[in-house]
C-alpha cells in the first residue's frame, strides 16, 4: 500500500511505519508481541515492552504512547496477567510514555506486547536502507539471548548467566537512540528475531551495499559460547542460519558455532548503527557517556561488485 504521506512502509523491511501529518510532524507506528521467554511474569512484561519500544528507538524517533496487546488463557490465574502488565507499565514509565489502553483475547498461551506510537520530524527518521560504502557498523548490546533463554527453558543454564541476559533484554534502547540522534547516522535497525546477520542483510539489501563483519569484535553475552559448545541452539536461530547461508561468505576460520551465534534470534537486542567513519569516534563516545551496554565497531560497509556476497564474515 502506498500513500503520499506514508514516508516509510513495508518496502524496505524497516522497523516501523512513518506517516507524515504535517511539515514538521510525523507519527511512527509499530506493534510487537510474543509468548513468555522467561518464567517470571513481571520480568516477561518488562522484556516484551522493551522489545516493542525498540522499533521506535531504531527509527530515531520518540515514543509517546502505547496500547497493550494481550493473549491469555482463561484457566490461568489473573494475577499472572496483572504482573505481566505491571512489568510492561514499569518500562513505559522508564521510557516516559503512557499506556492508554489495549486489547485482549483468550489464547492457549500467554502473549504480550505493545502497539507503540512515536513522533519524529518528517525526513529525520533513521531508516535501515541508507547505509553508505565506507560506513562503520556499531552494535549497542551483546548477542546471545536466544541461546541463553533456550538453555533456561531446558534448565541447563547457570542462574547468573540467565540473570545477566534478562537484564540485557529488559534494558531500553532509549539512551542508545538519543546518542545516535545527537551524532547523526546513516542507517539503523534493532537486532531481534532475525539475528545480527539477518537484520544486517536487510540493511545491506535495502541500501544496495555489502558488509564485512569481524566475528572477534562482536560482543557476546558471557556464557553463550559455553552453551553453544553443549549443543544448545534455538530452532529459530537454525532457521536464520539456513536462510542466510546463500548470502554470506564465511571465512575459513569461522566455526559452525560462530555461524550459529551470529544468526542467533535475539529478543530486545541492541541497535545496529551504520555511521560515517568520520563520525564513528563521536558516536562511540556518545554511546559510552549514555551508558549503553556496548559501543563496539563490529564491521564495515562496502560497495559490492556483481559476484560479491551481501555479507562477508571473517575472524
What positions do the PLM features span?
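A generic local secondary-structure boundary/capping motif
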Residues: 6-8, 16-19, 55-57, 89, ...
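Acidic-glycine-rich active-site phosphate/pyrophosphate-binding loop
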Residues: 17-28, 170-176, 241-252
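Active-site glycine-rich loop that binds ribose-phosphate moieties when present
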Residues: 115-124, 160-180, 254-255
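Glycine-/charge-enriched secondary-structure boundary and capping motifs
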Residues: 75-98, 105-110, 182, 192-315
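Glycine-rich anion-binding loops of enzyme active sites
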Residues: 21-38, 43, 62-158, 299-302
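N-terminal glycine-rich anion-binding loops that anchor highly charged ligand groups
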Residues: 3, 7-29, 57-62
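Small-aliphatic-rich amphipathic alpha-helix that forms the alpha element of a beta-alpha
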Residues: 41-67, 83-94, 172-184, 191-202, ...
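A structural signal for small-residue-enriched, beta-sheet-centric alpha/beta enzyme cores
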Residues: 137, 143-144, 188-193, 203
Amino acid at each position: 500500500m502506498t500513500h503520499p504521506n506514508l514516508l516509510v512502509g513495508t518496502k524496505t523491511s524497516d522497523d516501523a511505519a512513518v506517516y507524515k501529518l504535517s511539515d514538521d510532524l510525523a507519527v511512527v507506528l509499530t506493534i510487537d508481541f510474543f509468548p513468555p521467554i522467561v518464567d517470571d511474569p513481571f520480568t516477561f512484561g518488562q522484556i516484551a515492552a522493551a522489545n516493542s519500544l525498540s522499533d521506535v528507538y531504531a527509527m530515531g524517533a520518540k515514543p509517546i504512547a502505547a496500547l497493550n496487546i494481550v493473549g491469555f488463557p482463561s484457566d490461568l490465574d489473573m494475577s499472572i496477567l496483572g504482573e505481566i502488565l505491571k512489568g510492561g507499565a514499569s518500562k513505559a514509565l522508564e521510557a516516559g510514555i503512557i499506556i492508554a489502553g489495549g486489547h485482549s483475547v483468550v489464547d492457549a498461551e500467554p502473549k504480550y506486547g505493545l502497539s507503540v506510537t512515536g513522533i519524529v520530524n518528517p525526513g529525520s527518521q533513521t531508516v535501515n536502507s541508507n547505509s553508505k560504502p565506507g560506513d562503520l557498523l556499531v552494535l549497542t548490546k551483546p548477542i546471545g539471548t536466544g541461546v541463553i533463554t533456550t538453555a533456561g527453558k531446558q534448565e541447563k543454564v547457570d542462574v547468573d548467566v540467565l540473570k545477566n541476559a534478562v537484564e540485557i533484554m529488559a534494558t531500553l534502547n532509549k539512551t542508545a537512540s538519543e546518542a545516535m540522534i545527537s551524532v547523526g547516522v546513516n542507517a539503523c535497525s534493532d537486532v531481534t528475531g532475525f539475528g545480527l546477520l539477518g537484520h544486517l542483510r536487510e540493511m545491506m539489501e535495502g541500501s544496495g551495499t555489502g558488509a564485512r563483519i569481524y566475528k572477534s569484535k562482536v560482543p557476546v553475552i558471557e556464557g553463550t559460547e559455553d552453551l553453544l559448545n553443549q549443543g544448545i541452539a534455538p530452532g529459530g536461530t537454525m532457521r536464520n542460519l539456513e536462510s542466510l547461508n546463500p548470502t554470506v561468505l564465511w571465512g575459513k576460520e569461522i566455526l559452525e558455532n560462530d555461524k550459529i551465534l551470529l544468526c542467533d534470534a535475539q529478543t530486545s537486542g541492541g541497535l545496529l548503527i551504520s555511521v560515517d567513519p568520520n563520525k564513528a569516534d563521536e558516536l562511540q563516545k556518545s554511546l559510552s557517556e549514555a551508558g549503553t551496554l556496548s559501543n563496539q565497531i563490529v564491521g564495515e560497509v562496502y560497495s559490492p561488485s556483481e559476484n560479491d556476497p551481501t555479507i562477508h564474515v571473517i575472524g
